[in-house]
Regions:
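Metal-dependent nuclease catalytic cores that hydrolyze phosphodiester bonds in DNA/RNA
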Residues: 1-129
Length: 131
């Protein structure tokens, strides 16, 4: 089990959507998320080329499947870090469990402590995010 280290105090924040963009209200600031900033500043040439190559329908199917798999992985790994049991008996759940177990074996085995899970972090006046 990974121990929670109470070194930092985190300020709570509220996530909200504004015109399709993720934002946070935290410590009196209304801030764009890191995801929103990266989305607006990235070069999406490769992505557009990939969609053209795959076709819109197939690209959307792959994007959706990847997002669902990522959410499942996040849930499994978050519960592991928090020392909670979690089991998803669906086919996808069993697939992501095997993937998550590899991440735990290789990436989390040497980790003995963590400072926060799904906490809001921000830089006053610039951006916020949850990690």
């Amino acid at each position: 089990m990974i121990k929670k280290l109470d070194k930092y105090t985190y300020v709570g924040g509220t996530r909200y959507m504004d015109n399709g963009s993720r934002n946070y209200e935290v410590a009196g600031y209304r801030l764009p998320s890191v995801t929103t900033i990266l989305g607006r500043t990235k070069d999406d040439t490769f992505l557009k080329d990939w969609i053209k190559k795959k076709g819109k329908k197939e690209a959307e199917r792959i994007k959706t499947a990847s997002a669902v798999r990522g959410t499942s992985m996040n849930k499994y790994l978050e519960n592991y870090v928090l020392g909670k049991g979690y089991e998803d008996l669906t086919e996808l759940g069993q697939e992501t469990k095997r993937m998550a177990e590899k991440v735990i074996e290789v990436g989390l085995a040497p980790v003995s402590g963590y400072f926060g899970s799904e906490v809001t972090l921000y830089y006053p006046g610039l951006y916020a995010g949850q990690t």
